[in-house]
Amino acid sequence: MKRISRNKLLLGVVIALILSSCAKKLDLFPVNDLTPEKTFSTAAGYKSVLAKIYGTLSITGNAGPAGAPDIAGGLDEGSQVAFIRMFFNCQELPTDEAVCAWNDQTIKDFHGLKWTSSDPFLKGIYARPIYNITLINEYLRESTDEKLAARGISGADATDIKKSRGEARFLRAYNYWVMLDLFGKSTFIDESNQVGTDLPGEKSKTELFAFIESELKAIEAELGTVKTAEYGRVDQGAAWSLLARLYLNAKTYIGTEKNTEAITYAKKVIAGGYTLHSNY
């Protein structure tokens, strides 16, 4: 009897601990109080997030010069998280056009064409576009007509935010082009994937090419005409330029030449009135 009573007592204690540890679990809130409801409550909030999306191509995080990187995981913030630097390294160091004389980890493997999947520089340039795309997807989820109306955003503010959706989609297409150009395929997520619920899929070269091409053509009318956008923001010329580059390398991407299309969009860019600096 004593043994049975002792077992019952022990069972009761365990149940009590379990119940107490689960208490109010549904009442927990994010540690970061900048929830979408707060961040996107005003037109200024939308523009701040859009600026962050553009900024992912040049900055490494939200604090300067370093200390709060967007991407963790033991990667060096200066050399392995910065998009421009990593993209340059991957594109140029394997060629005879550039030399890196530093001994930073595996950087010289790019010269020797002997990098591996565990290379920290490659991990960084894989993670960066996917991180950027994740931000863009959230922006697209939160900038629908329904969300703007629910938040009382209307008039010129709503018009600018709707226009910015085309810019965000361009930047997403650009990031996917980076993945296509460097890796040949990519993890794929868009605004229909709910954060924390859907596992990301994967797209092949052909699928990525088709997605990028269709996105750039779909947003052409939504982007500002050439040289009319606010400084630093993309316009139709950016979409034409990326389409020209996509078509120029189509033989590598999908096995089919699209030189005629490349010429068509290159001519659009040239006709847009862009010029080289007089002294460069």
What positions do the PLM features span?
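Bacterial Sec-dependent N-terminal signal peptides
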Residues: M1-V31
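Helix-turn-helix repeat elements of alpha-solenoid scaffolds
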Residues: I133-N137, F211-A218, K258-K268
